[in-house]
UniProtKB/Swiss-Prot annotation:
It comes from Verminephrobacter eiseniae (strain EF01-2). Binds to the N-terminal domain of the chaperone ClpA. Pfam families: ClpS (PF02617). The lineage of its organism: Bacteria, Pseudomonadati, Pseudomonadota, Betaproteobacteria, Burkholderiales. The gene is clpS. Coiled coil: none annotated. Involved in the modulation of the specificity of the ClpAP-mediated ATP-dependent protein degradation. It comes from the Bacteria. HAMAP family: ClpS. GO terms for biological process: protein catabolic process; proteolysis. This is ATP-dependent Clp protease adapter protein ClpS. Residues 1-33 are annotated as: Disordered.
């Protein structure tokens, strides 16, 4: 089969930019800044059964606290009913809570730990 064009293809006419009349609007692109991620604090709750030494070991092992800092946080938990172990992104905070709860369960202690958004 032979296909024949009925007319030759035409190019669109060349356009020239219009002279600037001073009324042109120039839009500037601003770089978008993503907000920082929501941070969460890991809070350990006091109970009357978990030994203080176990709380200190957990703070050292899972939150990389030195003995003095871990003892200070443990005393805050004991005296105030709760204490902040650290501030992390959502995923890291959730992982740390799970680690603490697993360690407490394996050791037979009722220690509770939660994460809450930082205000």
């Amino acid at each position: 089969m032979n296909f024949m064009a009925t007319r030759a293809p035409t190019l669109p006419p060349a356009t020239r930019p219009a002279p600037d009349d001073g009324g042109a609007v120039v839009l500037e692109r601003r770089p978008e800044k993503t907000p920082p991620p929501q941070m969460y604090q890991v809070v350990m709750l006091n109970d009357d059964y978990t030994p203080m030494e176990f709380v200190i070991v957990v703070l050292q092992e899972f939150f990389s606290k030195d003995r003095e800092t871990a003892t200070r946080i443990m005393l805050k938990i004991h005296l105030d009913g709760k204490g902040i172990c650290g501030v992390y992104s959502h995923d890291v905070a959730a992982t740390k809570v799970d680690q603490v709860l697993d360690a407490a369960l394996k050791a037979g202690h009722p220690l509770q730990c939660v994460s809450e958004p930082v205000a």
